[in-house]
Amino acid sequence: MSAAPLYPVRPEVAATTLTDEATYKAMYQQSVINPDGFWREQAQRIDWIKPFTKVKQTSFDDHHVDIKWFADGTLNVSSNCLDRHLEERGDQLAIIWEGDDPSEHRNITYRELHEQVCKFANALRGQDVHRGDVVTIYMPMIPEAVVAMLACARIGAIHSVVFGGFSPEALAGRIIDCKSKVVITADEGVRGGRRTPLKANVDLALTNPETSSVQKIIVCKRTGGDIAWHQHRDIWYEDLMKVASSHCAPKEMGAEEALFILYTSGSTGKPKGVLHTTGGYLVYAALTHERVFDYRPGEVYWCTADVGWVTGHSYIVYGPLANGATTLLFEGVPNYPDITRVSKIVDKHKVNILYTAPTAIRAMMAEGQAAVEGADGSSLRLLGSVGEPINPEAWNWYYKTVGKERCPIVDTWWQTETGGILISPLPGATGLKPGSATRPFFGVVPALVDNLGNLIDGAAEGNLVILDSWPGQSRSLYGDHDRFVDTYFKTFRGMYFTGDGARRDEDGYYWITGRVDDVLNVSGHRMGTAEIESAMVAHSKVAEAAVVGVPHDIKGQGIYVYVTLNAGIEASEQLRLELKNWVRKEIGPIASPDVIQWAPGLPKTRSGKIMRRILRKIATGEYDALGDISTLADPGVVQHLIDTHKAMNLASA
C-alpha cells in the first residue's frame, strides 16, 4: 500500500494544548523510567480518604501474576465523580441525555446527579445490598443507568452492567457467574424506534434455576409498556426514590477493592468476567480522558458508546465525571430517524468532542454528503475513534467531512481488560497517519514479539504485547484467576498478551492489524484482515467490507470477502473483478480475494462489532453451527447471507 501521509500537529492546536510534543516526551520518559514517581504524582488528581504510601506492586510472572496499585490507599469513586465537584460546579451540567426520539432530552446538573445517586444508594441499602455484593444492571441508555452505577460505587457494591441487547440466556449466564443479588432494569428499552422487552428478558433469565442468588428486581419506568409483575420480588425504581433519603455518606473503599465486573466474550467457553478495582482504574480513566481528548473545563463531550461496554464505563461515566466534564448520553443509534442524527446532535448540544466507532463513521460515509446535510459542526474541536482499527478511507472522510480538516482525530486502541486507552495520538503532540493508533500513552510499554516470544526491534510486524503494568489494568477474571493467567500471561511469558497483531512503522507508530485469530496465512504470508478490509473500503464504490479466511487446497487459507456497496451502486460480475484487481493493486497479488460475496448488511452486535465467527461459518457452509445470534443488531442479515452463499454455490456447481 502507498506510504501513509502524515498530518502534522496544527500550530493553533499545539499552542493551546495540554500536552505538546516536548511535554509528551518528558512525561512518557518519566512514566517508564520511574513509574512510582510518575503515578504517585498523577494519582493526586483524585481525592483520597487515606493517602497511599505504596504505588506499584506488580508481577507478570505467570507463576505469580499479581497486580496492585496504590494498595494501602482508600477512596470512594462516587465521591470523586460527584461530591468534590459540588462547590465549584454544582450547577454545571453533568449529563446531557438525548433520547432515541429527537424530541426527548434531559439535562442533569452535578447537584441533581449527586442527589439522585445518594437516594438510590440508600434504596439499594434498603434492599439489603452491601459492600462486596454484586448488582447486575441491564438497562437502556438512560440517566438512571449511570445513577445505578454510581450508587453501587457509593456503597461499595460491585456492578456488572450487561448490555441491553443481550438475550435472556446471555443475561442468565452473567448473573449466575457473579451470583448477583439484585438486578436493575427497565420496563422496556427504546433504540432506533424499536422497543426491547428488558423486564421480560430478565423474567426469562430468572427462570433458570441457577439464578437463585437474585432476591430483587428493581424496574425503572422507561415506556410505561405492559410487563409481568412478581409481587414479592419486583419493585419500581420510582417508588424507592420517592421515600429514599438524599443523604448518603460514601463508603471508604480500599484502592484494590472491586469496582465492577464487565463480561467480554472468550474465544472459547463462557464469557470472561473482567474485574476492575477502584483506585488505579479511576486514576487511569481520568488521566486518559483528560489528556487523550485534551479536555478543557466547560466543554461538552460525547462518546456514542453504550454503558454496557467498557468504553461507556471509562469514557461516558467514570473518566468524564471524575474530571468534572459534561458528558452526553445518547439512547439511540446514529442513523435514526435518519443518517443526519449525529450531526444534528452535535449542533443541538454544541458538542466539542465526538468519540465514536468506525462502523458508525462508515455508515455515514456510505451516504456521503447527506450525512452532514444542513449541519454547522463549528462547535467540534476534536474527533475520536474506538472499537476497531479505522480504515484510512473512513479516517479521511471523518477528518474532511465531519471535522472540516481542522479537528485532530484520536484513533484509540485499548480493550475491556486494559481499563483505558493504551495507544493513541495526543492532539497537541502527535502527527497523524490515517489508520494508525500511533504511540503509547504514559506508562504503557508496548512491544512486538514473534510466535516464539522473541522481541522484534525496529519497523516490523508481530504479536502485540505490553511489557509492564499500568494502573487501569484488569486485576483478574471474576472467580477464575487461573483463566486470567492462562489467557493473558502464558502465551508469552512475563508479558501481557493483547491477542492483537500489530505493525510498527519506521516512525515507531503502531498499526493494529486485527485479532491474531483474524490473521490470515495465505501461502505462508501473514496478512491482517484489517489491512485487506482497508484496501477494499478505499474503493469509491464500497461502503464496508469484512474479510475471513477459508480453507484452500493450495494456499492453506483463501481470502473470502463480504462487501457492502455504497447506496445506488449495482452489484455485477464486472464490479467483482474490478474489486479483486483493486486489492491486487493496493496490497499485492497475494492479497487478491478468492471470493467476493455481496452483502446488503453485515452481522454486527449492537455495539457495532462485526461477528466474524458467523461470517466464517457461512463462508464454509456451516449454517447449522452459527451459535447464538440473538445479540445481533439485525439477526435477519444472517439468513440473507446464507441464502446468497447457497445461490453462489449453486451457480458455480
Swiss-Prot record:
One of its GO terms (molecular function) is acetate-CoA ligase activity. Its cofactor is Mg(2+). The keyword Heme does not apply. Gene3D superfamilies: 3.30.300.30, N-terminal domain of ligase-like (3.40.50.12780). Mg(2+) binds at residues 537, 539, 542. The modification N6-acetyllysine is found at residue 609. InterPro entries: Ac_CoA_lig, ACAS_N, AMP-bd_C, AMP-bd_C_sf, AMP-binding_CS, AMP-dep_synth/lig_dom, ANL_N_sf. ATP binds at residues 387-389, 411-416, 500, 515, 526. It catalyses: acetate + ATP + CoA = acetyl-CoA + AMP + diphosphate. Disulfide bonds: none annotated. Its EC number is 6.2.1.1. Acetylated. Deacetylation by the SIR2-homolog deacetylase activates the enzyme. PROSITE patterns: AMP_BINDING (PS00455). GO terms for cellular component: cytosol. It is an enzyme of class 6 (ligase). The keyword Nucleotide-binding applies. GO terms for biological process: acetyl-CoA biosynthetic process from acetate. CoA binds at residues 191-194, 311, 335, 523, 584. SUPFAM superfamilies: Acetyl-CoA synthetase-like. Keywords: Acetylation, ATP-binding, Ligase, Magnesium, Metal-binding, Nucleotide-binding. PANTHER family: ACETYL-COENZYME A SYNTHETASE (PTHR24095:SF243). Catalyzes the conversion of acetate into acetyl-CoA (AcCoA), an essential intermediate at the junction of anabolic and catabolic pathways. AcsA undergoes a two-step reaction. In the first half reaction, AcsA combines acetate with ATP to form acetyl-adenylate (AcAMP) intermediate. In the second half reaction, it can then transfer the acetyl group from AcAMP to the sulfhydryl group of CoA, forming the product AcCoA. Belongs to the ATP-dependent AMP-binding enzyme family. This is Acetyl-coenzyme A synthetase 1. It comes from Pseudomonas putida (strain ATCC 47054 / DSM 6125 / CFBP 8728 / NCIMB 11950 / KT2440). The gene is acsA1.
